[in-house]
Regions:
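Extended, charge-rich low-complexity interaction segments
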Residues: 50-63, 114-126
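Internal catalytic or translocation cores that form aromatic/hydrophobic pockets or channels
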Residues: 55-84
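Conserved nucleotide-binding/hydrolysis micro-motifs of P-loop NTPases
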Residues: 2-3, 27-29, 91-96
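PRPP-dependent phosphoribosyltransferase catalytic core
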Residues: 74-142
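Structural beta-sheet core signal
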Residues: 23, 58, 87-89
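Charged, well-structured alpha/beta interaction segments
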Residues: 1-12, 66-68, 75
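Short, glycine/charge-rich flexible loops or terminal/linker lids adjacent to PRPP-binding catalytic cores
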Residues: 17-56, 70, 98-101
């Protein structure tokens, strides 16, 4: 899974939340197959709880165009109709192509369009944000 899944699990554990924590794989819900093709490693979605009527928190590492969040919400709706969805993101880098905004954002940054911001995690759970196609490390946290 991706940085959003790592971040969601970390927040769930660190905050001592008692509710269930699920993981989405949005590979089949993306709208850019013609640009990137199908992912060969589709991971199973892990939602072992009913979503219908529940207040959900959707967590992602980097909010950019809004298309990943749209895909995640489409998959959630396939599991039921939640009462509400709140969006939590670590980084909002702007550049929206869809009318989606986060309810909670840790950091808002301007990043050139040709750069990708990637959340990485080492074996002991330390997170680092890196710019791909660049040489700067933006943020680290453990």
């Amino acid at each position: 899974h991706s940085g959003g899944a790592w971040l969601a699990q970390r927040l769930h554990d660190d905050l001592g939340l008692s509710g269930a924590c699920g993981l989405l794989d949005i590979s089949l819900y993306r709208d850019d197959f013609d640009q990137i093709g199908l992912h060969t490693q589709v991971m199973p979605t892990q939602i072992d709880f009913p979503v219908a009527g529940k207040h959900l928190i959707l967590v992602d590492d980097v909010l950019y165009t809004g298309r990943t969040i749209r895909a995640a919400m489409n998959e959630l709706f396939d599991h039921g109709r939640p009462a509400s969805i709140k969006l939590v993101v670590l980084i909002d880098r702007g550049g929206r192509q869809l009318p989606i905004s986060a309810d909670f954002t840790a950091l808002t940054v301007d990043i050139p369009l040709h750069e990708n911001l990637v959340l990485q995690r080492n074996k002991v759970g330390v997170f680092a944000l890196h710019l791909e196609n660049g040489d700067a490390t933006c943020v680290t946290h453990n």
